[in-house]
Design a protein with these regions (language model features):
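Short, surface-exposed ligand- or partner-binding patches at beta-edge/loop junctions that are enriched
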Residues: 84
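A short acidic-Thr-Gly-centered motif at the start of a beta-strand
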Residues: 31-38
Length: 151
């Protein structure tokens, strides 16, 4: 069992912020709950320029504004989907659309910021990177590990 302190090292303020963004009935996965990322179809719901800075291993870019044009036939309904964005708000919105279409979906708790802060690997293409596009400078205050990119 992971002690509470180790499982959720993010600041109280960050956890409070996330609690205002997430719907209570939409399932989230904490990074430490993911034994094997390849067990999921990982979808990056950020904008293309954010994805190009860094992403989770083998993540498929679907975008947020662009998501309505994504071909859902590319996904396997028998394999769970993990969606993420910067903090989890955009990904929850995309995730809800996937649920409506019959997919089992989880939102990555805290988004790529929490993932990076927990020191899980990030990639630019196939190579590891420590850069994280934080969407805006305002969201960047929550990134404690890695190199912040805003543009």
């Amino acid at each position: 069992m992971i002690p509470f302190k180790e499982a959720l090292p993010q600041s109280f303020a960050y956890k409070t912020l996330l609690s205002t963004l997430y719907e209570k009935d939409f399932p989230v996965l904490y990074p430490e709950e993911i034994d094997d990322l390849s067990s999921y179809q990982v979808l990056d719901t950020r904008e293309k320029e954010e994805y190009q800075v860094s992403h989770l291993k083998d993540a498929i870019w679907v975008g947020y504004d662009q998501f309505p044009t994504f071909n859902l036939d590319r996904l396997d309904k028998s394999k769970p989907v993990l969606v993420y964005c910067t903090v989890g708000a955009r990904s929850q919105s995309v995730g809800k659309k996937l649920v409506e279409n019959g997919y089992e979906v989880y939102n990555l708790y805290g988004g790529i910021i929490h993932w990076a802060n927990e020191e899980y690997p990030l990639y630019k293409g196939e190579k590891r990177t420590d850069k994280v596009h934080t969407y805006t400078r305002a969201w960047g205050i929550w990134l404690n590990k890695g190199v912040k990119v805003y543009e």
